[in-house]
């Protein structure tokens, strides 16, 4: 058995090692590609394109592990639900809950422009 915390630490370590960049870049993107193409679209649309992760499931377990962008940061995460009753409805609800949780964290990077940093002085202000 592996804990979610251990899995998240492994992902964070991989992220900081250039040898693993190909594996990280190959992760499916929420609402965009792979096994996550239909995830987040209805459950947490604000997270579409901001979650890169791998799904996992066996009877009674639903999991998602990867990275979520939040502003100018990227967080490694691992969420593992366990001991679920093995029904489509319950496992779908677990996936939706995971999506909504990540939707609370996900945020696009804010682009700062020169006008956001310092407004131009008005001609009247520079004349005084």
Where are these regions (language model features)?
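Small-residue-rich helix-loop
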Residues: 1-128
């Amino acid at each position: 058995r592996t804990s979610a915390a251990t899995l998240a630490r492994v992902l964070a370590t991989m992220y900081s090692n250039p040898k693993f960049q190909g594996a990280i870049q190959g992760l499916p993107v929420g609402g965009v590609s792979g096994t996550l193409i239909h995830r987040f679209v209805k459950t947490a649309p604000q997270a579409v394109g901001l979650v890169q992760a791998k799904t996992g499931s066996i009877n009674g377990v639903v999991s998602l592990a990867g990275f979520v962008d939040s502003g100018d940061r990227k967080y490694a995460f691992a969420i593992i639900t366990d001991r679920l009753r093995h029904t489509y409805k319950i496992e779908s609800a677990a996936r939706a809950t995971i999506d909504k949780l990540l939707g609370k964290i996900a945020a696009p990077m804010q682009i700062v422009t020169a006008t956001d940093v310092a407004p131009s002085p008005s001609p009247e202000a520079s004349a005084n």
